[in-house]
């Protein structure tokens, strides 16, 4: 009897652990392939909650990578002006909008801006993150504890590397940009 109970407890623990972990994994579908992302609710709970809500509501679908700087990062997430499938799409204004939800208070943490890091974009105000985020191509330690890290690419970084780069003379602005096909929980 004790052995059966012990095995059931182990099975329950393993099942629960996998379920908890999976709810914080996302799939970012790009034109070249799927990117698997691990979210970090333990260090950025409000940012993770926002990303998951917007993603699972479909708000990021068809949103362009409006600012992409080679050797640095790819920025996306302007759900107001950057959604290429809606009437309000305006590539010239992409990067200036966000969602209708209130801005988030910063959740700066000790996670580094390494290759594959996902971090929230914001204005000069540290409490202005809303929907925009970026993925680092290379380490960017000068951003550490200045921007909220909320996730990391765990598979498919080679597809992020294929995102069309912007004009280095124009702060990475991209003509005819690549877009997020879909973004959702795994």
Name what the model sees in each region:
Residues 9, 16-186:
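Cyclophilin-like peptidyl-prolyl cis-trans isomerases
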Residues 2-11:
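Sec-dependent signal peptide recognition
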């Amino acid at each position: 009897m004790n052995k059966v109970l012990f095995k059931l407890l182990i099975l329950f623990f393993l099942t629960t652990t996998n379920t908890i972990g999976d709810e914080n994994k996302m799939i970012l579908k790009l034109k070249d392939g799927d990117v698997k992302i691990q979210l970090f609710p333990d260090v950025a709970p409000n940012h993770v909650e926002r990303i998951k809500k917007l993603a699972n509501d479909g708000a990021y679908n068809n949103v362009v990578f409006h600012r992409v700087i080679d050797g640095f990062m790819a920025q996306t997430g302007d759900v107001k002006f950057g959604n290429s499938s809606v009437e309000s799409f305006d590539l010239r204004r992409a990067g200036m909008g966000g969602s209708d939800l209130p801005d988030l208070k910063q959740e700066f943490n000790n996670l580094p801006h390494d290759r594959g890091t996902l971090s929230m974009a914001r204005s000069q105000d540290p409490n202005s993150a809303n929907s925009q985020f970026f993925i680092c191509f290379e380490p960017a330690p000068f951003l550490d504890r200045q921007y909220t890290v909320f996730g990391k690419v765990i598979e498919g970084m080679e597809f992020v590397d294929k995102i069309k780069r912007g004009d280095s003379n124009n702060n990475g602005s991209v003509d005819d940009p690549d877009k997020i096909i879909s973004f959702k929980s795994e």
